[in-house]
Curated annotation (Swiss-Prot):
The gene is Artn. One of its GO terms (molecular function) is receptor tyrosine kinase binding. The keyword Glycoprotein applies. Gene3D superfamilies: Cystine-knot cytokines (2.10.90.10). Keywords: Disulfide bond, Glycoprotein, Growth factor, Secreted, Signal. One of its GO terms (biological process) is lymphocyte migration into lymphoid organs. Residues 1-39 form the signal peptide. Residues 43-124 are annotated as: Disordered. Homodimer; disulfide-linked. Interacts with GFRA3 coreceptor and RET: forms a 2:2:2 ternary complex composed of ARTN ligand, GFRA3 and RET receptor. This is Artemin. It is found in: Secreted. The lineage of its organism: Eukaryota, Metazoa, Chordata, Craniata, Vertebrata. Its main location: secreted. The keyword Glycoprotein applies.
């Protein structure tokens, strides 16, 4: 029997399985790569929920690639903030320095306090009204009484109230240029004297009320 072209031969039946077995691994790898590429480029284009509207966040694809690798989205990478340089520690607090205005105010306050104390001392030594309890029998008015009354009087210096006459008189007396009369000496400053008076009443030993006018001072001044 002759071998014809139209009939399959034993040689063609032997070559066909070898050719198909050689191409099958290549086709399988190409199909797998095509699926992985489509999934990585547009993982949600095939999902009907993505076309209909917003949907909950889906988990990233975890398809395994050839060689044991796993596909990941770029959005999963977390951007870490750049490291910040350490801030220098603040210097320790030093002793508080007093500012010049505060120092000036303190000095002025000290001077003002000194002046006020001097003024108080001068006022205490100056002409002013004073009072004291005294017995009526010691007044020298001829009344017999066991009572005590408050007697007000004036005392103190009037140097600050001196006039030009008083200053010149004191200078002449100090230089010996002015001869004073025998047994007397001129006064070179005013005298602290009462300027107003009041009456005082008391009871004597006979239980009789006595009133003395212009007995006690109520105001003082430098006179002369």
């Amino acid at each position: 029997m002759e071998l014809g072209l139209a009939e399959p031969t034993a040689l063609s039946h032997c070559l066909r399985p070898r050719w198909q077995s050689a191409w099958w691994p290549t086709l399988a790898v190409l199909a797998l790569l095509s699926c992985v590429t489509e999934a990585s480029l547009d993982p949600m284009s095939r999902s009907p929920a993505a076309r209909d509207g917003p949907s909950p966040v889906l988990a990233p694809p975890t398809d395994h690639l050839p060689g044991g690798h796993t596909a990941h989205l770029c959005s999963e990478r977390t951007l870490r903030p750049p490291p910040q340089s350490p801030q220098p520690a603040p210097p320790p607090p030093g002793p508080a320095l007093q500012s010049p205005p505060a120092a000036l105010r303190g000095a002025r306050a000290a001077r003002a306090g000194t002046r006020s104390s001097r003024a108080r001392t001068t006022d205490a030594r100056g002409c002013r009204l004073r009072s004291q309890l005294v017995p009526v029998s010691a007044l020298g008015l001829g009344h017999s009484s066991d009572e005590l009354i408050r007697f007000r009087f004036c005392s103190g210096s009037c140097r600050r109230a001196r006039s030009q006459h008083d200053l010149s008189l004191a200078s002449l007396l100090g230089a010996g240029a002015l001869r004073s009369p025998p047994g007397s000496r001129p006064i070179s400053q005013p005298c602290c004297r009462p300027t107003r008076y009041e009456a005082v009443s008391f009871m004597d030993v006979n239980s009789t009320w006595r009133t003395v006018d212009h007995l006690s001072a109520t105001a003082c001044g430098c006179l002369g």
